[in-house]
Amino acid sequence: MAQALLNAGFGNFVAADRLIAIVSPDSAPIRRTVSEARERGQLVDVTCGRRTKAVLIADSGHVILSALQPETIAGRILNSRGDLSGA
């Protein structure tokens, strides 16, 4: 079975089927989640030095920081699944 990969920006790809959440990094609980993932060694930063605009949370506990907007990432997932309704 082929694994669906999601372009997380700057030539970096993430397994789309493993994602459980795509959130904005602005709230205190998400900042705490990012900090805890860094301490556990499960933080993946794919921003290439740019500002973090989305935090992707995987079912394995890994937290991925992306410089793309959450809406952009969600749109890419919907497009890859063939669901263009956006709902």
From Swiss-Prot:
InterPro entries: RemA-like. NCBIfam families: PRK04323.1. Belongs to the RemA family. This is Putative regulatory protein Synpcc7942_1027. It comes from Synechococcus elongatus (strain ATCC 33912 / PCC 7942 / FACHB-805). The lineage of its organism: Bacteria, Bacillati, Cyanobacteriota, Cyanophyceae, Synechococcales.
